[in-house]
Amino acid sequence: MTKLSYRQAMLIKHTAWMNTRLLARGPRPEDARYVPLAVRMLTLVGCLNYAMLDLESELTASGLFHHETKRRYTQAQTLVTQAHGIAWSMLRKIDDRAARQYNDKTDEAYRCISDCILLEAPQRSYNIVLSLCRIISSLNGRISGRYNFNPAKPLVRIPALLECIGIEDCKIDGIIELNLTD
């Protein structure tokens, strides 16, 4: 058994007391505002994972997937995979049903995004990736500390990583946000 100092024991007691008060009080009013934003952001992180896979196949098919592009794409894909994996495992820890709903919502959202963007490949996937990164960053910035998803913060670097591809950014953020419904 480890010995605790008096201050440590009092801190543990106070933390336990505060937790019981928070549970008894129920959700805070700002939870009603932040939860839909957090759900949308996590869904878009999943969509970004799909968009990166589409981007790889479209770049390969068009012959633009050269050494420097592959290297930078791999760095970007690593960032996306980490964020998506953490989001999925976080929801799976809550409940298996929550993880399945996350997958279903992500599939539906990506299908909607793909259907509303009428650009040609690989410009289509490239613009979807860049726009999703900007939207995720914007949503994450609007969410307070409790719902803030720190693994999504590095996704801001993806547009700079993929800049070497040389495809024009059409800034389709508004189109994606307009077509996504909760």
Descriptions of predicted regions:
Residues S5-N179:
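Long, low-complexity or tandemly repetitive, helically biased scaffold regions used
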